[in-house]
Structures are given as structure tokens and as C-alpha cells.
Amino acid sequence: MKKYLLVLFLFAAIAVVAQDKLVISHGPYLQHLGETGVTIIWTTNKNAVSWVELAPNDQTEFYLKERPKYYSAEYGFKDVSTVNTIRLSNLTRGTTYRYRIYSQEVLSHEGTKVQYGTVAASDVYRAKPLKFSTTDQSKEKKISFVVVNDIHGHNDLLENLLNKGGYKSADFIIFNGDMVSEMQSEEQMFGSFMDTAISMFASEKPMYYARGNHETRGNFANAFPQYFKSPSGKLYYLLRRGPICFVVLDCGEDKPDSDIEYSGIVAFDQYRDTETDWLRKALKSPVFTDAPFKVVILHMPPFGGWHGEDEMATKFVPLFNEAKVDLMLCGHLHKYIHQKPGNGVDFPVIVNSNTTVVKAKADAESLNLKIINEKGEQVDLIQLKK
């Protein structure tokens, strides 16, 4: 009996140690990839200081020599967090890099004394190092991309649509909102779609995100900006890739702020006023005006009859008409709609369904979008010419 209890105690102790071990719980994944920089994000189960080691994409072993380290740090202090966000800057345009992530647990910090624990890192011994490539606008004459939306935590659907859209050959992926039904916790968010995205592409291929109305719901909703970064530092931004300037907007909620569902905690009308002020200036930027094609990424379409949709129509659409936008890509309605110009909207609006994927390619003279369903069948083809 004593031996049995001893064995049971040892197994329990091992289990506790295993639970206490620092691990990389989610990621890494790429955000805000541009010509000279990228943001790399991952999470750990405990507070840690974190860094990235960077190496050129040559034929040398990663272990050949000490690689330069880039820390998660702000105001001269290394960040201690479970959400590890590292911005790599001053990189070379159009260059492929290999990288490895590290986190070291911080056990205590008293006065000037810091006690550290174990280190967790991505594997570069049994597996090839992760890679990313910076962009080069002067050479990016053609691009291809894939758009999905309204996944609502259905990972099988996400995987199927990405495959049907040919994500492996695409330059980047766009998530156009409602990837979750609500934001409950970090674990729920990653489990709903991001773990799948990371396993498929997001550690090496960039993903750009337009927040939908369902990402604004739940007690974890205000944490969204911690995990998804943009060139503007906001949830709305301009993105120039190849011949396209993408205007990525944040739609906010679809009902009036006073609706009982929000319990008085939201102020999206005011938020969209601020976004409109930003948009008015952004549409005069050379990043936008110099692009052959101008495409809006916005979760809610400017029609449908609800308050949020009406806000899209009254606040954003007049500015887009004046700026001569070529196309708007939306979601939200869970059905496919190809709305041609008219009724006060001077450009086509494509409402992608939750069961279709947009497979797009563009050069300076043409923008082609195939709409493909779950079975891999093409349901529509949109061709824009310059």
C-alpha cells in the first residue's frame, strides 16, 4: 500500500511539474508584414521575456553562429508577458529570412533582482527554421490573395475554404471578420480559428484582418488589438500590395449602441465618426491615390437595413464614391451577393458567403476574383480592367 501511494505521489508530482513548465501555447504568427519590417506574435502559458533570433536564408546551419536577437521591449525595458509581440525593423526589402522564437520564464522580480526559469523555443534542429519574406513594392507587379469570412469558429470549414482557394500559392490571406461568434478568452479565440491558421500558413505567410461585429462581443473583445497589428496602429488602415491599395476598415457593431445586447458598454457610432475622419485623410494619401486598383475590405456591406449597415452607407460610401474606389469586399450576410454599381454606390460590392472563398489575382491592368464554394465549384467570376 505504501509503495502504491508513493508511486501515485510521484506521478502526481510529475504531472504538477509538467503543468508548471513554460511552453509556447500558441503561435508564432506574422502580422504587419511590410517592406522593411514584420511583427511576430506568440503566447506562453506563463509570464516571460521573449526574443527572436534572425538569420539570412542561406545554406548555413542555424546553429553555425550566434544569431542577432530582437527582444520584445518598450521604453528600454524587456516586456514580461504571456502575449509576446516583437517588431523586427530595418530589414531589407524583398528578402527572405529564417527565424526562431524564444521565451524565458520570469519567476520573480524584486527590486533589481530578477529570477529566471526555463526557456522555451521553436525547433530548428528536427524541423526547418520558420521563414518569412519582406515585400518590395518596386518589384511586386503581380499579387494573389485569398479572402474568407464568417467562419464563426468552424475550423473544418476554414481549412476546406483555404484549400479550395489555393492558399498555398497565394501571397497573403485576408480574414474579413466574424472568424469567431464572440471573444470569450485567449484559448477560445485561438481554438476557434487562429490555431488552424497558424498550422496552415500564418507562421510564414502574412494574414491581414478586418474586424467584424462578432469580434466586438464577449468579455475578451477588448483584447483583440493585442493580437492583431496593423501599419496604422489602429484596427483600420491602408495596405499597399502590388497594384492594389486595400482600405481595411473596422465596421463595429450592427445594432444601435443603446441596444440591450450591449449592456451600455459600447460607443461604436462615435468610434466610426473617428474612423471616418481618418478615412477622409487616408484617401488623399499617395499610398491610395497612386495605386492602379483601390479595394475596400469591410465586413458589413453598405446595405441590408440594419443600423451598422446604414452607418457604412452614410459615413463611408460618399468618401469612396469621391475617391473612385474600384471594389468593396464584404461578408456578414452569410450569403453570396454580387451587387453592381447603383443606388448611391458607384462601385461593385461583393458580399462573400460564409461557405465561399474569394481567390484573387491582380496586375496593373486587371483584377480577377473567382468565387469558389465548399465543393470547389466556381460560382462567380469578377473581372475588372484598367
PLM regions with names:
Residues Y102-K131, Q188-K284, K315-N321, I337-I371:
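Extended active-site neighborhood of metal-dependent phosphoesterases/phosphodiesterases
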Residues M1-L22:
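Bacterial Sec-dependent N-terminal signal peptides
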Residues K142-I143, D171, Y236, P243-I244, ...:
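Alpha/beta-hydrolase fold active-site loops
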Residues E140-N219:
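Conserved, compact domain cores that house catalytic/ligand-binding motifs in diverse enzymes
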Residues N47, I151-H154, M179-E182, N213-R217, ...:
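Solvent-exposed loop/turn segments at secondary-structure junctions
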Residues Y262, F268, P286-M328:
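Active-site-proximal segments of metal-dependent phosphoesterases and phosphodiesterases across multiple
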Residues V146-N149, F172-D178, K205-N213, V295-H299, ...:
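Active-site neighborhood of phospho(di)ester-bond hydrolases with catalytic His/Asp-centered motifs
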Residues A18-V146, Y167, D363-K386:
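Acidic, histidine-bearing metal-coordination/catalytic regions of metal-dependent phosphoesterases
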